[in-house]
């Protein structure tokens, strides 16, 4: 078996609603989740619906660059 890049990589998911709002008086931060993805099965950016504690609802979280 060839030794190479790891198949599973760590990614960070960020709430797109908080990012669009920018600095809002109600929102005190930006929701981020840390997870892993399989590089072979998901070559594109990961997009999941997760709970944002700052928006207080389920929103779309996209993968961001480190």
Swiss-Prot record:
Keyword Lyase among record annotations: no
Gene Ontology cellular component terms for the protein in this record: chloroplast; ribonucleoprotein complex; ribosome
Chief location: plastid
Subcellular location(s) of the protein: Plastid, Chloroplast
Keyword Chloroplast: yes
Pfam families given in the database record: Ribosomal_L33
Record's keyword terms, sorted: Chloroplast, Plastid, Ribonucleoprotein, Ribosomal protein
GO process annotations (BP): translation
Gene3D superfamilies per UniProt: Ribosomal protein L33 (2.20.28.120)
Cross-referenced SUPFAM superfamilies: Zn-binding ribosomal proteins
GO molecular function, one term: structural constituent of ribosome
Family matches, as HAMAP family: Ribosomal_bL33
Family: Belongs to the bacterial ribosomal protein bL33 family.
Listed name of the protein: Large ribosomal subunit protein bL33c
Biological classification of the source: Eukaryota, Viridiplantae, Streptophyta, Embryophyta, Tracheophyta
